[in-house]
Amino acid sequence: MTRRYWNIHLEEMMEAGVHFGHGTRKWNPRMAPYISAKRKGIHIINLTRTARFLSEACDLVFDAATRGKQFLIVGTKNKAADSVARAATRTRCHYVNKKWLGGMLTNWSTTETRLHKFRDLRTEQKTGGLNRLPKRDAAMFKRQLSHLQTYLGGIKYMTGLPDIVIIVDQQEEYRALQECITLGIPTICLIDTNCDPDLADISIPANDDAIASIRLILNKLVFAISEGRSSSIRNS
């Protein structure tokens, strides 16, 4: 894997609050190598390590994007949801930002059935088919469509399992991470000081509670994905 320069600056990360971890009582001892200090009862993340692993993750997704690989970004908590949707939409990645439905990946056949139903209902709505149904039936299908849009809207174009999954909060998205581990899907995780750095293929130590921190990390990753896709087009 070729190493590239991704314009990752410590000052920029400090401004975004990437270095602020959790309280010192709420930590995972395995995060010790990624912590540089304690300040006012809070662990401070070593941003040099963050920059190293973020750069490594950018190299990985760039190379994967040049080969046409598919990405899924997962971040369902309120502080992450908007940033996840924007970053994914900008680079045509799949995303889950509302709720992780159990078995979304490990029980892919069920997810695929739901996606087919979702596409059929969207087609019916666009062609006016729902309006030709009795009111009660139309209302029921519209409720189904709304529910599917909420939970599957970000993966509506997904036709198979993703090649790489980017996870914003390891603890919040633990079920998603476990499904990836079960299936052998490579993962990139933002990990705060209360996480286990050994669970993901690449763990990026960072504040996973601040919107600015989440946005900065995601923006670097999706920029690398976008660059990889552009490189693939130029070289084809």
Curated annotation (Swiss-Prot):
Its main location: plastid. Keywords: Chloroplast, Plastid, Ribonucleoprotein, Ribosomal protein. GO terms for cellular component: chloroplast; small ribosomal subunit. One of its GO terms (molecular function) is structural constituent of ribosome. Pfam families: Ribosomal_S2. It comes from the Eukaryota. InterPro entries: Ribosomal_uS2 (IPR001865), Ribosomal_uS2_bac/mit/plastid (IPR005706), Ribosomal_uS2_CS (IPR018130), Ribosomal_uS2_flav_dom_sf (IPR023591). The keyword Plastid applies. The keyword Ribonucleoprotein applies. HAMAP family: Ribosomal_uS2_B. This is Small ribosomal subunit protein uS2c. It comes from Cucumis sativus. The lineage of its organism: Eukaryota, Viridiplantae, Streptophyta, Embryophyta, Tracheophyta.
